[in-house]
């Protein structure tokens, strides 16, 4: 059976130790940062494009700057709480302080989405601006972040797909990825992160 070996890529770009605590910059964190910055620039360009708006853009550039802060909080808090509630509630109920250990990983796309939607609605109500046009702007600016996030999922060797005998199947590392009932030897799986990066992010 032909397959693609998983590339030797570290999930960490680099790490430093300060006062006995190791801080690492991971590809996943970089994907979040780059996705938010690219999305912000895209929305800014759309706001400035007068031809897009018959009656003016739905918010000002100053409001966009404030919205970015709300979105960042929504992504981080929603993503983390979503992971806690959806994937390991028993562990975090027994060890609640572990919720704060974001450097150990654990974010949820669904939680991040709900966090951003909550932040969007709260911000628009506070600023007295229409929710739907602002939601349209965010939706148009989201694909680059999704693309980068899925590429980071691939680098982390997580969220892989079903076993496959197709030649582009990837032999992901780890006991869970290699646990394929009925398959002896190397188990190749669909690189679903790459599929999703292309379908969601381009």
Swiss-Prot record:
GO biological process: lipoprotein biosynthetic process
Database matches in InterPro entries: Lgt (IPR001640)
GO function terms (MF aspect): phosphatidylglycerol-prolipoprotein diacylglyceryl transferase activity
Alphabetically ordered keywords of this record: Cell inner membrane, Cell membrane, Membrane, Transferase, Transmembrane, Transmembrane helix
Pathway field: Protein modification; lipoprotein biosynthesis (diacylglyceryl transfer)
Keyword Transcription: no
Family per similarity comment: Belongs to the Lgt family.
NCBIfam families, per the entry: lgt
Name assigned to this protein: Phosphatidylglycerol--prolipoprotein diacylglyceryl transferase
Encoding gene per record: lgt
């Amino acid at each position: 059976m032909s397959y693609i070996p998983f590339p030797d890529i570290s999930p960490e770009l680099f790490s430093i130790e300060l006062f006995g605590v190791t801080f690492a910059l991971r590809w996943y964190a970089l994907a979040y940062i780059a996705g938010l910055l690219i999305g912000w620039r895209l929305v800014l360009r759309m706001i400035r494009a007068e031809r897009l708006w018959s009656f003016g853009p739905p918010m000002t550039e100053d409001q966009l700057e404030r919205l970015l802060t709300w979105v960042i909080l929504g992504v981080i808090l929603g993503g983390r709480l979503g992971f806690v509630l959806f994937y390991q509630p028993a562990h975090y109920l027994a060890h609640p302080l572990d919720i704060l250990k974001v450097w150990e990983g654990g974010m949820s796309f669904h939680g991040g989405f709900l966090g951003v939607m909550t932040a969007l609605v709260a911000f628009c109500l506070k600023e007295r601006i229409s929710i739907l046009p602002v939601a349209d702007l965010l939706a148009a600016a989201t694909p680059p972040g999704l693309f980068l996030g899925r590429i980071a999922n691939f680098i982390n060797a997580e969220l892989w797909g079903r076993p496959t005998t197709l030649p582009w199947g990837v032999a992901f590392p780890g006991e869970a990825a290699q646990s394929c009932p009925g398959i002896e030897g190397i188990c190749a799986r669909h690189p679903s992160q790459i599929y999703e990066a292309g379908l969601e992010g381009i």
